[in-house]
A protein has these predicted regions:
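Bacterial N-terminal signal peptides that target proteins for export
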Residues: 1-9
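Lumenal/extracellular ectodomains and adaptor appendage modules
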Residues: 22-391
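Bacterial N-terminal signal peptides
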Residues: 9-18
Length: 391
């Protein structure tokens, strides 16, 4: 069957004036990541549906702010992309296909917004503003979520397999895997040791034992193990999670003068609290039922996050940064076409640019990936329209 492959990246750079010049300021953030959008994908292999044409419309009537004071202010932003597909079923039988449309993570400037009444950062959901239609009528659509590092491009080979129905099966991180949470108190470090560092060494079989220290700053490879370390001071509480079998020699702490971990100093690190849970309990510690994220998508993202933190380290070490946990959103919906039938499928999604404030005026970059077109049996005409006053 004929296949037309489109693998280009369509990038729109919009400036708020014709002439730009670089600007620099010390100790100030100058770049905020946006999100990449992409086209509709078919989940089913060997699907006979073809795309006769696509109308891709970018509506950029305003630029987003790099900081929002409220959720309402962020949700008032109007940037969007609309993909209108004309699908046709050339087969002599009815085809029901499940489609997904990935539309990126929330941007840096909108993922979490400070809520002054609660003194907390609130996760934002913007998906109710958008949706999917067939022949002009809204249809049921699920919003799915998968782990995706900010600033990384969409990859069919890497991102599609993460979109799993139900709970993922993993060789190590199983729902019933035992997890111990241990909390240690730090005492007796002299005031002169401003760069005091706590550390312990792991020499475990990572297929049986893995260890995560929440407050760590670094991991160093030793001849026969790894050393996990982090800055500390008197009064600190250190939290360690042990997955699977406990380390053969437990967690044995040492205190050092600084991060080089050469000269030991006086002080005590004492176990004050220990509790056993399951990995499922661990995975859902911060799950919010009102977030719109399904339990299975959240769990699968946690498994992927922990595996990403384990893959570069031997001897049972896990290195993760809580701030690096970010989710990409997908629309998932079903189309049914009778033999020879043609229909119009319209998908509208938010459009968030990357912002580079290192120039005056700032540069806003909108990226839309066309490579998913290669998942279709045939892809015909593509028309791109940009509606904006900034040209």
């Amino acid at each position: 069957m004929k296949r037309k492959v489109i693998t280009v990246i369509f990038t729109v750079l919009l400036l708020s004036a014709v002439f730009i010049q670089p600007t620099h300021a010390n100790s100030a953030q100058r770049h905020w990541s946006g999100t990449d959008s992409t086209g509709a994908l078919v989940k089913d292999k060997n699907c006979p549906l073809v795309v006769d044409k696509e109308l891709l419309t970018f509506d950029v009537q305003e630029f987003p702010k790099n900081y929002y004071n409220s959720i309402e202010e962020f949700l008032a932003y109007t940037g969007k992309v609309t993909a209108e597909y004309t699908f046709r079923n050339p087969a002599d039988y009815t085809v029901t296909a499940t489609l997904v449309f990935p539309f990126g993570n929330l941007p840096h400037y909108g993922e979490y917004i400070y809520d002054s009444p609660t003194d907390k950062y609130i996760a934002v959901s913007d998906t109710e503003k958008y949706g999917v239609k067939v022949n002009g009528e809204p249809i049921d659509v699920a919003v799915r979520h998968t782990l995706k590092a900010r600033g990384t491009p969409f990859s069919l080979d890497e991102d599609m397999p993460k979109l799993t129905d139900g709970y993922i099966s993993d060789s190590f991180f199983r729902p019933d895997l035992p997890v111990w949470v241990q909390q240690y108190s730090v005492e007796g470090i002299g005031a002169e040791n401003q760069a005091a560092t706590a550390a312990f060494v792991l020499r475990e079989d990572s297929s049986k034992t893995r260890v995560l220290w929440a407050e760590k700053n670094g991991i160093a490879t030793l001849k026969d193990g790894i050393r996990i370390s982090g800055w500390t001071k008197t009064g600190d509480t250190l939290t360690v999670y042990i997955f699977g079998e406990p380390p053969k020699d437990g967690i044995t702490w040492s205190l050092y003068e600084n991060g080089a971990c050469k000269k030991k100093i006086d002080g005590n690190i004492t176990l004050k609290y220990s509790e056993q849970m399951t990995f499922r309990d661990f995975a859902f510690r911060e799950y919010d039922n009102s977030s719109g994220i399904s339990e299975s998508d959240w769990y699968n993202a946690q498994v992927a996050f922990m595996n990403d933190g384990s893959k570069d380290w031997m001897y049972g070490g896990i290195y993760t940064e809580k701030s690096a946990f970010s989710l990409m959103r997908w629309y998932e919906y079903t189309l049914t076409l009778e033999p020879g039938q043609t229909l119009t499928n319209t998908v509208t999604a938010p459009l968030y640019p990357a912002i580079d404030a290192g120039y005056t005026p700032s540069i806003h970059t909108y990226t839309y990936l066309l490579s998913p077109a290669k998942t279709w049996a045939q892809f015909g005409e593509l028309k791109i329209v940009v509606n904006t006053p900034y040209y």
